[in-house]
């Protein structure tokens, strides 16, 4: 049943959603991914339950007690609304480079070009922030923000 799946051109973290009826695959994508959409799940008080089968990077659920080898079924749901960006250090744990991703994101959002340059905007690509976007409790579209910051720099230089 294609309605219960999200078809992604590319990988789960950096790919884009494809409509099975009218969509197309990206020219440079080397994989196609299908994950459950998650719209068939009905959780009564999902936020208030211990969540033994749910993945959480921040140990918000008790599933971390089951051991590190536990397998999780992840789907495409955001599970909640957008929230304010908080400085929790969760990006630092998964970011592959030695820069301050939270401060860089705040500089990009504020359109502060001098601060973006000082914090290393020239060293990053939106895909570098894919894991940050996955573990983000604020559900911010971090890759889109970084792409906007890089586009702003390009526009300023030309």
PLM segments and residue spans:
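Redox cofactor-anchoring modules in respiratory/redox and cofactor-processing assemblies
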Residues: 1-158
């Amino acid at each position: 049943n294609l309605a219960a799946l999200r078809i992604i051109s590319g990988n789960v973290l950096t790919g884009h959603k494809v409509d099975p009826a009218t969509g197309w695959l990206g020219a440079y994508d080397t994989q196609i991914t299908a994950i459950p959409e998650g719209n068939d799940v009905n959780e009564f008080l999902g936020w208030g339950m211990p969540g033994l089968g749910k993945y959480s990077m921040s140990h918000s659920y008790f599933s971390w007690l089951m051991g590190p080898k536990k397998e999780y079924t992840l789907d495409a749901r955001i599970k909640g609304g957008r929230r304010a960006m908080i400085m929790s250090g969760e990006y630092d744990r998964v970011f592959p480079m030695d820069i301050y991703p939270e401060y860089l994101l705040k500089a990009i959002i504020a359109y502060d070009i001098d601060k973006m340059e000082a914090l290393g905007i020239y060293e990053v690509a939106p895909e570098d922030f894919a894991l940050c976007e996955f573990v983000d409790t604020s559900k911010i579209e971090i890759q889109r923000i970084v792409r906007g910051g890089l586009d702003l720099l390009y526009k300023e230089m030309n």
